Amino acid sequence: MKQSKYKYIAHSENSNGAEQSMKQHSESVAELMRSFALADDFAEIYSYCGLLHDIGKYSKGFQNYIRSREEKEPHAKWGAYIALMNKLVNIAFPVIGHHAGLPNRDAMVETLGLCAKDENRWKNIQQAMEEDYFIISMCDNSSFNKIGNVFQKELFVRL
């Protein structure tokens, strides 16, 4: 597979001097999340949370921050935005809250509404994902509907 000319990174150099690419990070977190699934029916939806959680790190602002410690740019909202655009509200909650904790629904909708207005940044993230050959085929709500009762769904959102 062809490699991107620009290396999008998720994490700066560790103690061994190695950076972690965005694609590698997202795919490894997706696999880790899949392993946390309590049942096979939940594996797909857990995996999508892992894929989406750091998508905002593809933005130019975040890439500048991670390389030079310039102004920090929030990133969690962009994966949640993708989930919401695909009508996966229950995936949006854990994705947007993976650093700051779960927002209430109104706060999340307000934040994601701001994403919708920031067309330039959204296009930048999409373009970066394409350049990095990082494609996400979204699941549908049927994956979430396999989670049996309301208590299991609540546990998923808070996991």
Residue ranges and their predicted role:
Residues 2-159:
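Accessory nucleic-acid engagement/destabilization modules that flank
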